[in-house]
């Protein structure tokens, strides 16, 4: 609940919106809105709308066992609620409560316009174990993107500091200096998989850290913004080849993470329709070897 009110900007420190990375100091004035404690819910007969939502979730499943779900989240569906967001994965998971009233829990997030692998814990035990794997960087995530131009060199490591920059209408992550207020270190490995002349490149990305908009900000910083990115890709200065949709071309392609009960979860998501259309139009081969597999672990 506390994380939710911080995310919504309802927690204030000295009159300003607090960030989850802020550290409190003695003498600061903290305002917390009245806590609305949820009463435990129990599983019951689903309504017609609930049954439809359950069918939608079932159609998204890439992997499932007693502890874990991996969903293929479609582009355009938010993971969690926020200002003006009424439909999101966290809310949809209400229909999957078990006989004890336990609802599956999110253990990480994807941006609304990013599609692909979203890991969900079905039990408290799994949630604790999976959250620990992310915290200790035992999880390996691979993303595919279509970017403007061709990065040089074709394989490399991007290491910067990122900080949130807010305006009245929006917020973005900007490149920051070490020591800047709110700045966090972000590291990404990238590899060019295939190119379409010199205009576009299919790039595989492996984030070491998990900062907000990290991959999107890093590719924009390298002058190879992800095609269709509404925050970091300036379409006015770049002409899309015919047939390509101006939508975010970013897929959470694969996740590899230790299973809470031993072994490994390894799930992959297919290209979403708008990216598959672009791959076909550009003659890119989706089954080509992905060189990011050889990127080092940190």
Residues of each region from the PLM?
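RNA pseudouridine synthases
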Residues: 1-298
